[in-house]
Amino acid sequence: MRQAFADAQAALPFVVAQGRNIETAIYEARYPEYSYRDLMPVVTEGNQWAIGTQFYSMQLAGEAKFLSGAANDMPFNNVSWGEGSHDYAMIGSGWEWNLEEVNQASLYGRNLNDLKAMSASRSTERLLYDIATTGSTEKNWRGFVNQSNVQTITAAATGTGSSTLFANKTPQQILIDLNGLLKLVPQSSNNVELADTLALPLEVMDYIATVFVGTEANSPTILERFRTSNVYTARTGRPLSITTADSLSRAGAGGGGRIVAYRKALDVIRFHLPMPRMVLPVHQKTIMGFETGIIARTGGVEVRLPGAMAYMDGVSEPA
């Protein structure tokens, strides 16, 4: 029979060894339901303990024109520089083991229960997802779905009873709305920007993925038709990326659905994550207990080119 541990100090080597197994499981865990990486580029570069990041932006201005051999009016190009900063903050979630749990695990030759650890891991990832999508009121951060400087329009009131809701529209009206949002980005940027990604509320994705354009047996769904008949694909020959975010179901005016069209690139939008999930070493808390936890550091979402994004509200009822 295994000898019982008399106190936490004696049990510490066993707990540390068990903690390494749990740490591996935490780092290997993936949470597809909290996939902020699918929505925007994630930046993990830089020192994980830095106060924040400082960045520089530039704007080029200039032109070329016809000149004579004796000209003295050569047009010169100019570069204007801007400077900004973004602060980081730390989040965390922990768990504990007591001497009773440790001795029982050792007695029966089993691993320490990792349920609390995996719950802490999920909680941390959930908070990162919430910060990435909706921001943080505590830190005065905005997220992917509620940037104040992104242009916002309302879906056309062309549905039944002048409704803007997609559920009250024909497939043709929905396709016009979706392409209208895609066209808004180049129109408002003098054709400099082009949205290559569309993020939809879950209920809108479900609707257009299951409603057919026509009544024929081989009729495509609205989603299938839109994938091949959208202005981005028509202009570039490349497929439009279409994704979802549950927070979009209540991000619009009045708590309704919101669609986001944007160019998914680092120079447009980024989620600062200098320290992804890090498991802390096991610490002996008392003579009968241990504690550890997970921390992460983030700076939230930063939109550097709001003109490369656009919102459309009124597409679905409040969730």
Located regions from the model:
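Sequence/fold signature of self-assembling virion shell proteins
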Residues: 1-39, 46-47, 210-319
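Alpha-helical scaffold segments that mediate packing/assembly in large oligomeric complexes
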Residues: 96-176
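Hydrophobic, Leu/Ile/Phe/Ala-enriched alpha-helical segments that form helix-helix packing faces
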Residues: 124, 128-131, 178-189, 226-230
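Assembly/oligomerization interface modules of large self-assembling protein complexes
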Residues: 15-93
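Extended, solvent-exposed, turn-rich assembly/linker loops in the middle of proteins
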Residues: 145-221
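Short, flexible beta-strand-to-coil junctions
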Residues: 43-48, 56-61, 191-194, 199-213, ...
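Oligomerization/assembly interface segments of phage tail-like spikes and tubes
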Residues: 93-95, 292
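Helix N-cap / beta->alpha transition motif
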Residues: 98-100, 200-203, 305
